[in-house]
């Protein structure tokens, strides 16, 4: 090789520092181009760690509490890396409105949750079904048939009967400690069982225990949900075998319920008589047994999925809200006294309250609103971005997991004066409701995926609280002081009390058995 030529070529090559500087500049230019043209303006958030993302920060407490603290620092649209997932936390009414109303089609999808995939018969439930034709049909059936206002009113006698059973139990145990949490959950489960299945079920206790296990696992923060690509981890964490065990037991109970209904329907058809009363399972079986090819048709697995949906969502929402309302009333005796005086004056002379009496109880309704503000039944309303879009000027990538933090919105000091104070009077003269129209108060979500069971849950809560306020005076059991009442939550698909509410009741208004 000609050494002169080689030396001349080397003189024309850039030096190593110059080359590295150029490459670094090019890399920064590419990254800037991606941010400005590809990803757009990203929501702020704490810096994630490799592999973990921001999961280490959630270890400091309940996820919705930690996220509330973080949003006060980073803003109402905050980005978190949860394992492999891109999550955007929404913590203001304005941002929630953009998700649930302005861009509701773009956020009409529910994020995939591993527990739900197994338990809901391949996403056949109303709550978690993918946005599409099946979900639209089921939504229509829910709103017009299963949980319409007319149908909810048809369950009035069931509600009154089961609430009265609770009143009788408390009266027969007055002066003794009562696990009110347990009794409230039993009451709401009995209401749902009779509405959905036609009667209380012998397997109901087992059904409820299995539901509680699902609620703990199905919050979306399991390893399988945070690292969806690492499928080999699922058996190792123990979640998959636990879910399969629960699903097998739950399916057997649901299969028996469906089989019993089929026998009842067949007997009625053979005798050429119409069923006296159709419960919710009967309504679903009408679609499973449809013979017209043009009619919407359900499989038996879909019937079971929707039945499970109704039972779990209905009982948990009503019971959790009643439990928190009673907790706040005990913690705030001024409010309890005012609620008791209202119902005792409005229903004076009556031995029991009828559902028609509820319309007179304006202050009780304010108590329920205030309970929903501080204690939404579920801490988050989850969504998934179906496509790339913008929220409050920030670019949200397709497939991003959206968590609307109801805990943060209910305690936002820019929206609510003294947000930690339980003060129902804040809603006096206000048009704010909880039916998805006012995004500062959305315990049931909003938009087209709003919970269809609002009327059903509200009716249970109103009648239950009215009877408890009317007939009894209350105090905490075991000599516990009001200021020492533990108001901690358990985190799951719902946010129940961490400790059961233990109380002592004294009959104030006598009644006829």
From Swiss-Prot:
Tissue expr: Accumulates in mature fruits and in juice vesicles.
Pathway field: Secondary metabolite biosynthesis; terpenoid biosynthesis
PROSITE patterns reported for this sequence: CYTOCHROME_P450
Catalytic activity: dihydroniloticin + 2 reduced [NADPH--hemoprotein reductase] + 2 O2 = melianol + 2 oxidized [NADPH--hemoprotein reductase] + 3 H2O + 2 H(+)
Keyword field: Heme, Iron, Membrane, Metal-binding, Monooxygenase, Oxidoreductase, Transmembrane, Transmembrane helix
Any one Pfam family match given in the protein's UniProt record, by short name: p450
Enzyme category, top tier: oxidoreductase
Entry protein name: Melianol synthase CYP71BQ4
Transmembrane parts of this sequence: 10-30
Entry cofactors: heme
Recorded name of the encoding gene: CYP71BQ4
A GO CC term assigned to this protein in UniProt: membrane
Function: Monooxygenase involved in the biosynthesis of limonoids triterpene natural products such as limonin, a compound with insecticidal activity responsible for the bitter taste in citrus. Catalyzes the conversion of dihydroniloticin to the protolimonoid melianol.
Localization terms from the record: Membrane
Source species, domain of life: Eukaryota
Family: Belongs to the cytochrome P450 family.
Mode of membrane association: Single-pass membrane protein
Protein's organism: Citrus sinensis
Known EC number: 1.14.14.-
Binding site for heme: 451
Molecular function GO terms recorded: heme binding; iron ion binding; monooxygenase activity; oxidoreductase activity, acting on paired donors, with incorporation or reduction of molecular oxygen
């Amino acid at each position: 090789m000609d050494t002169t030529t080689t030396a001349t070529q080397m003189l024309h090559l850039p030096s190593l520092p110059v080359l590295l500087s150029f490459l670094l500049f090019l890399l920064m230019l590419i990254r800037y181009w991606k941010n400005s043209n590809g990803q757009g303006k990203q929501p702020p958030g704490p810096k994630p760690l490799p592999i973990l993302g921001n999961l280490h920060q959630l270890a400091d407490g309940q996820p919705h509490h930690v996220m509330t603290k973080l949003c006060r620092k980073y803003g109402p649209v905050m980005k978190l890396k949860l394992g492999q997932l891109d999550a955007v936390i929404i913590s203001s009414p304005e941002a929630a409105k953009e998700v649930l109303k302005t861009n509701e089609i773009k956020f009409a999808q529910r994020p995939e949750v591993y527990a739900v995939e197994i338990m809901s018969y391949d996403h056949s439930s109303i709550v978690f079904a993918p946005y599409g034709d099946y979900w639209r049909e089921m939504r229509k059936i829910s709103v017009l048939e299963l949980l319409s206002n007319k149908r909810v009113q048809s369950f009035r006698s069931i509600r009154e009967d089961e609430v009265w059973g609770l009143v009788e139990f408390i009266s027969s145990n007055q002066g003794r400690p009562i696990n009110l949490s347990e009794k409230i959950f039993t009451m709401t489960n009995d209401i749902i069982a009779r509405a959905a299945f036609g009667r209380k079920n012998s397997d109901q206790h087992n059904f409820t225990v299995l539901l509680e296990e699902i609620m703990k696992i199905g919050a979306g923060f399991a390893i399988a949900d945070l690292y969806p690509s690492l499928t080999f981890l699922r058996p190792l964490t123990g979640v998959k075998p636990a879910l399969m065990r629960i699903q097998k037991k739950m399916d057997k109970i649901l299969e028996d319920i469906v089989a019993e209904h089929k026998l009842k329907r067949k007997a009625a058809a053979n005798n050429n008589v119409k069923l006296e009363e159709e419960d919710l399972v009967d309504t679903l079986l009408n679609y499973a047994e449809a013979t017209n090819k043009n009619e919407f048709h359900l499989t038996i697995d879909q019937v079971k999925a929707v039945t499970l949906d109704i039972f779990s969502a209905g009982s948990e929402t009503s019971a959790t809200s009643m439990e928190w309302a009673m907790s706040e009333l005990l913690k705030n005796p001024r409010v309890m006294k005012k609620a008791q005086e209202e119902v005792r004056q409005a229903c004076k002379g009556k031995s029991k309250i009828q559902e028609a009496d509820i319309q007179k109880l304006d202050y009780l309704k304010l108590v329920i609103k205030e309970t929903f503000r501080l204690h939404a039944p579920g801490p988050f309303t989850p969504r998934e971005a179906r496509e790339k879009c913008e929220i409050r000027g920030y670019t949200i990538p397709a497939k991003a997991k959206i968590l609307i933090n109801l805990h943060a919105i209910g305690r936002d000091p820019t929206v609510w004066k003294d947000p930690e104070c339980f003060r129902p009077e804040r809603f006096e003269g206000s048009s704010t409701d909880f039916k998805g129209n006012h995004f500062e108060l959305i315990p049931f979500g909003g938009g087209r995926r709003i919970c269809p069971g609002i009327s059903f849950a509200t009716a249970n809560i109103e009648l239950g609280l009215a009877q408890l306020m009317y007939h009894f005076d209350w105090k905490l059991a075991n000599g516990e002081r009001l200021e020492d009442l533990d108001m901690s939550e358990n985190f799951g698909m719902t946010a129940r009390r961490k400790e059961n509410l233990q109380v002592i009741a004294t009959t104030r208004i006598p009644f006829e058995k």
